[in-house]
Amino acid sequence: MLVKKVRELGEQEKLNSIVCSFDMRPLWKEMGITPELLMVGEERQERVKDEVDYLIECPFTESFRQKSAEDFIQEIIHDLFHAKYVVVGTDFTFGCEKRGDVRMLAEYADQYDYQLIVIEKERYRDRIISSTYVKEVVKDGDVGLAEKLLGYPFEVEGTVEH
């Protein structure tokens, strides 16, 4: 839903549509963490490439993690992207210790000349659709439901051992 809204705004306003996501792998590598992911960067790029003009994955390094919420708004949203619209989910957080949130984005919208659009979480049977929910249904063996929640075919990549 969020990507669709970004694409629609780009088309309507004759602007480049950009999705910015955070590539957590550099930080996880530093911390020695190997989380279960539904999709890694390359898969995300493949999935989104026809939907928007640009997918930018910011490497989430320790120095990026230390960036204040105010600096994130000024340096990333304003100076780097020159954003006219900022489209986020209701629980979007950013900046050091997740101090930035939707409320802060709204407070700075006039100062940095962007319009904030907040997308509500999608639900299925009164439950918020999340990566955790999708992982649960996959573990339960319900790939059909996983595909319904994702909105695209669920894929698994790996090596088959005999």
Language-model regions, residue ranges each:
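Nucleotidyltransferase catalytic core that binds NTPs
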Residues: 1-162
